[in-house]
């Protein structure tokens, strides 16, 4: 086949494949156009998740009739004039692709009334071609309506997600703009239901509870740092206020939401050791830099940026988070006040049911312990510099030869030969220590208990539910709320009982294995699991949710086990031959006598 030039129609549809990846991407592009047009109020409406209908209206400066007809042509824009402008982008858009690519794969109507004009224009487009135009009189600004997205590319339309999933993704896009531009008003309507109707806010602090209703102002620490031409502002949460995913971490660079793992990593590094493994803080951070320091033209949807000095930005974020925590008196070390190992106070029974308030509270049962202030951090550095040298250097192969039980199964015959393992106790309120014939067995109490609960729940025909005397009204952000409506049956199989009364949602029953104090948090994490995994098969959904429920109801780090409880857990672990928790983490490890002997040159 000879080389030839592609028709314009084909070029547009190829470009649309990069820009239009779902209904959410159409909303994103149209809202960005509205904000670039100096809009102070933006209204978004969708139907059927956006697959049937999308509308974005604004009160911006509008377009003259001749500009409007030009705007749907490829590579037409008002935002840049020359190549040098690409080095100092101050707007959301600049490529001149959005309207042309969206109109090429949909039916579209655009009405615009320019500022200080008596007459505007409405045009109707189908598959990229204007099929009708007429005069328009209306309020200042622009309204774009998109119908039947991807109607002329059925092969791509079938890859759109379900209406509910597409709708949730649109909601998340709207939420990002709500946070990014607090001084703009936003109205959001989904399938005729008013979700948000927000007037301009003076501070971002007013918008955070809208997007994250589980947060209150007392959970938040203000971040304000400026260094080396980089300004970082926003809010983070205390180390105890976390979630099991990064959905609570949002970073905006020059007002633009970006999705870059290295920036999330910088936030988490700023917390030092204060975060429990597998837990992530809430962080809404705004990074302002000279536009010439970043390149926003590296991602089709502009979700990533390239920094001229990425390490400088990384260090600035880490320092901003760390300084904020120190100023609040929060330690970035995890140090706990516990009884001396081996003392008689090392064991205490775990209170059950509703009395188990302290250990069931996710903010108290994570093992964060006493907070150190900045002076203690400095003392720690001082002590590290005065380490006493040893005459004998340990054999590093000891660490390499530690044999995890994840790599081999316990043989039941071994248990018979050695009798029951001899329990030493619980170390650090997280690890059970026991002697076997081969060496020292160390068991993660949470991981082991989590797997035992998971297996028990899996064998049960139905998880028992206990009715609450006083129903709890749930305050859920919109993505969780819509997901709960969609997956109500799956959630109720776990023992949660849900009641919808208009736009209000009540928790009327909880799994019998959970206390009331952790039930709402457990439900939120179940919903987040569904949202992140996007599971559709009922068996996979149920299995995945069981593991989440088991994790929430299991013994936590910081929960003190009595000697009999630790022994019972150890016996069940060996009896069931459990190697991993439901999330794949090993539950135990074995340090063999021969490795200890080699370490001590015996």
Swiss-Prot record:
Comp. bias (Polar residues): 342-352
GO molecular function ontology, one term from the record: ATP hydrolysis activity
Biased composition (Basic and acidic residues): 353-367
Disordered: region residues: 337-367
Pfam families hit by this protein: DNA_mis_repair, HATPase_c_3, MutL_C
Example of a GO biological process term: mismatch repair
GO annotation, cellular component aspect: mismatch repair complex
Keywords per UniProt: DNA damage, DNA repair
Domain of life, source organism: Bacteria
Function noted in UniProt: This protein is involved in the repair of mismatches in DNA. It is required for dam-dependent methyl-directed DNA mismatch repair. May act as a 'molecular matchmaker', a protein that promotes the formation of a stable complex between two or more DNA-binding proteins in an ATP-dependent manner without itself being part of a final effector complex.
Assigned protein family: Belongs to the DNA mismatch repair MutL/HexB family.
Protein known as: DNA mismatch repair protein MutL
Record organism: Kosmotoga olearia (strain ATCC BAA-1733 / DSM 21960 / TBF 19.5.1)
């Amino acid at each position: 086949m000879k080389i030839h030039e592609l028709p314009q129609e084909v070029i547009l549809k190829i470009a649309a494949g990069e820009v239009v990846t779902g209904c959410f991407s159409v909303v994103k592009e149209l809202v960005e156009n509205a904000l670039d047009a100096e809009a102070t109020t933006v209204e978004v409406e969708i139907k059927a998740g956006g697959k049937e209908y999308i509308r974005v209206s604004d009160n911006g400066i509008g377009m003259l009739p001749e500009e409007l007809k030009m705007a749907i042509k490829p590579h037409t824009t008002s935002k840049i004039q020359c190549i040098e402008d690409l080095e100092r982008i101050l707007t959301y858009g600049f490529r001149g692709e959005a309207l042309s690519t969206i109109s090429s794969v949909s039916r579209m109507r655009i009405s615009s009334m320019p500022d200080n004009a008596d007459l505007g224009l409405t045009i109707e487009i189908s598959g990229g071609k204007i099929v009708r135009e007429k005069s328009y009189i209306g309020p200042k600004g622009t309204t774009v309506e998109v119908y039947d997205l991807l109607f002329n590319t059925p092969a791509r339309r079938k890859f759109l997600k379900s209406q509910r999933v597409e709708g949730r993704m649109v909601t998340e896009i709207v939420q990002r703009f709500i946070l990014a531009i607090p001084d703009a008003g936003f109205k959001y309507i989904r399938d005729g239901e008013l979700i948000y109707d927000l007037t301009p806010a003076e501070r971002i602090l007013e918008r955070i509870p809208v997007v994250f209703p589980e947060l209150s102002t007392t959970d938040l620490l203000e971040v304000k740092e400026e260094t080396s031409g980089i300004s970082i502002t926003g809010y983070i949460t205390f180390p105890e206020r976390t979630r099991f995913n990064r959905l609570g971490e949002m970073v905006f660079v020059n007002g633009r939401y970006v999705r870059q793992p290295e920036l999330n990593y910088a936030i988490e590094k700023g917390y030092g050791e204060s975060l429990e493994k597998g837990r992530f803080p809430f962080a809404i951070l705004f990074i302002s830099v000279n536009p010439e320091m970043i390149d926003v033209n590296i991602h089709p949807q502009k979700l990533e940026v390239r920094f001229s000095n990425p390490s400088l930005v990384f260090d600035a974020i880490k320092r901003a988070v760390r300084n904020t925590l120190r100023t609040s008196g929060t330690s970035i070390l995890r140090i706990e006040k516990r009884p001396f190992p081996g003392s008689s106070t090392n064991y205490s029974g775990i209170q059950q049911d509703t009395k188990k308030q302290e250990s069931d509270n996710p903010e108290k049962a994570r093992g964060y312990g006493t907070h150190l202030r900045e002076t203690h951090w400095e003392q720690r550095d001082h002590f590290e510099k005065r380490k006493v040298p040893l005459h004998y250097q340990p054999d590093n192969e000891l660490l390499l030869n530690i044999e995890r039980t994840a790599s081999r199964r316990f043989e039941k015959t071994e248990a018979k030969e050695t009798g029951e393992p001899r329990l030493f106790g619980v170390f650090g309120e997280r690890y059970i220590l026991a002697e076997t014939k081969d060496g020292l067995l160390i068991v993660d109490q949470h991981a082991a208990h989590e797997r035992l609960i998971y297996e028990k729940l899996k064998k049960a025909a139905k998880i028992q539910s206990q009715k609450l005397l006083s129903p709890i009204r749930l305050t859920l952000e919109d993505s969780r709320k819509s997901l709960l409506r969609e997956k109500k049956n799956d959630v109720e199989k776990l023992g949660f009982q849900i009641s919808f009364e208009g736009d209000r949602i009540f928790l009327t029953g909880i799994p019998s294995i959970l206390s009331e104090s952790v039930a709402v948090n457990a439900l939120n994490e179940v919903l987040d699991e569904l949202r992140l995994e996007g599971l559709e098969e009922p068996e996979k959904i149920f299995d995945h949710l069981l593991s989440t429920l088991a994790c929430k109801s299991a013994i936590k780090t910081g929960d003190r086990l009595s000697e009999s409880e630790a022994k019972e857990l150890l016996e069940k672990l060996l009896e069931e031959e459990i190697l991993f928790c439901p999330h794949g983490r090993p539950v135990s490890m074995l340090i063999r006598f021969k490795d200890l002997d080699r370490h001590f040159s015996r």
